[in-house]
């Protein structure tokens, strides 16, 4: 017996998809929420049981008209007939859930442990409001198991959504030019909102400060922001997180994008006022020449913002990296190598350590001292 479908459509037009699933972080006149869902029965083959689309007006005062609530109403009826079956549910939504919908979904999942939900969102709805942030944290928090997994749609998810739910007329999905940049902004914002933490193995592998390492082609950048108030630097915990470089051909970046440039994209999105701010970055590699030049330009154009960079290792591409570091230092950035204190601070602040203390690796202090001397020589233009 199949359940009755209400307020659903099978496919959407191409124009509807591009208009509503535009991932520009701030958009107006997008009052309809589109929720494309896929339900699979859990098992070795995980066959797809159903795929359809709910839609609803996001600004309606009654949350029952929102597509998330319509899905829950429909799915509850189905679960009454198939309460023993385990399901894996995937949503592709144009807006992330509002506060009431997020709370309702969290309650539903808490009562039905046989259902797992992954939510891919094109944009974040009212992400700057504290009550909304708290609702999403409750929805995605761990309570004996992950309740819901929420991710920003990247190129692959947009393509999957296009293939499964759009009447594309046989044409392939063609992303907008700014899709990768917007993805990075939204991904970092969601990480701040949900207070994502780094895996311990990722931290120790990428932030190990051995001067010469092989296979470490990624750059991780942890950041925090403070505001000067009555001669005291006050942490802004809403702007704290980490990001990594985007590799070529991943998430729609044909040429890739370094972590420092992704971070520079993010700062204007915070809309900081004219007060004095201090931004501190902890990076697994020091900036390359191009990134150092861009960071120098940024702080020169934003005199109310000071920048401190603590690097685990010096990025040596045999090019103009030394010149870039000197330019960045000359334009006002503080650049230093991470020592035990900074490594411990990163571990305590950005890593999912689960109560475990930071354990320094062999040679940490010696490597830090040697790298500090090398950096000092570079900044003083004495070679390396």
From Swiss-Prot:
It is found in: Cytoplasm; Nucleus; Cytoplasm, P-body. It holds the Pfam family NAD2. The active site is at 260 (proton donor). Residues 29-139, 215-328 form the CMP/dCMP-type deaminase domain. Zn(2+) 1 binds at residues 66, 98, 101. One of its GO terms (molecular function) is cytidine deaminase activity. Residues 1-61 are annotated as: Essential for cytoplasmic localization. This is DNA dC->dU-editing enzyme APOBEC-3G. It comes from Macaca fascicularis (Crab-eating macaque).
């Amino acid at each position: 017996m199949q359940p009755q479908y209400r307020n659903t459509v099978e496919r959407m037009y191409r124009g509807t998809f591009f208009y509503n699933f535009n991932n520009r972080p701030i958009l107006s006149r997008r009052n309809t929420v589109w929720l494309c869902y896929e339900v699979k029965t859990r098992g070795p083959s995980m066959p797809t049981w159903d795929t359809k689309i709910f839609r609803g007006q996001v600004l309606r005062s009654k949350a029952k008209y929102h597509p998330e609530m319509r899905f829950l109403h429909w799915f509850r009826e189905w679960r009454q007939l198939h309460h023993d079956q385990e399901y894996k549910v995937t949503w592709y939504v144009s807006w992330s859930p509002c506060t009431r919908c997020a709370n309702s979904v969290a309650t539903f999942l808490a009562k039905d442990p046989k259902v797992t939900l992954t939510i891919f969102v094109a944009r974040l709805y009212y992400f700057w409001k504290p009550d909304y942030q708290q609702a999403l944290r409750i929805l995605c928090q761990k309570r004996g198991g992950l309740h819901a997994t929420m991710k920003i749609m990247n190129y692959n998810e947009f393509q999957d959504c296009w293939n499964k739910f759009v009447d594309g007329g046989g044409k392939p999905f063609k992303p907008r030019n700014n899709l990768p940049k917007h993805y990075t902004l939204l991904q970092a914002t969601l990480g701040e909102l949900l207070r994502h933490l780094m895996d311990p193995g990722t931290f120790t592998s990428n932030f190990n400060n051995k001067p010469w390492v092989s296979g470490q082609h990624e750059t991780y950048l942890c950041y925090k922001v403070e505001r000067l108030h009555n001669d005291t630097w006050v942490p802004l915990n809403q702007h704290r997180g980490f990001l990594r470089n985007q590799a070529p051909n991943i998430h729609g970046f044909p040429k890739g994008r370094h972590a420092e440039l992704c971070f520079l994209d993010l700062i204007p999105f915070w809309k900081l006022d004219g007060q004095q701010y201090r931004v501190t970055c902890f990076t697994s590699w020091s900036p390359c020449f191009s990134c150092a030049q861009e960071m120098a330009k940024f702080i020169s154009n934003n005199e109310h913002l000071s920048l401190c960079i603590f690097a685990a290792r010096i990025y040596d591409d045999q090019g103009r990296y030394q010149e870039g570091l000197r330019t960045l230092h000359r334009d006002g950035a503080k650049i230093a190598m991470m020592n035990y204190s900074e490594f411990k601070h990163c571990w305590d602040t950005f890593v999912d350590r689960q109560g475990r203390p930071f354990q320094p690796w062999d040679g940490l202090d010696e490597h830090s001292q040697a790298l500090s001397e090398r950096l000092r020589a570079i900044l003083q233009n004495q070679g390396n």
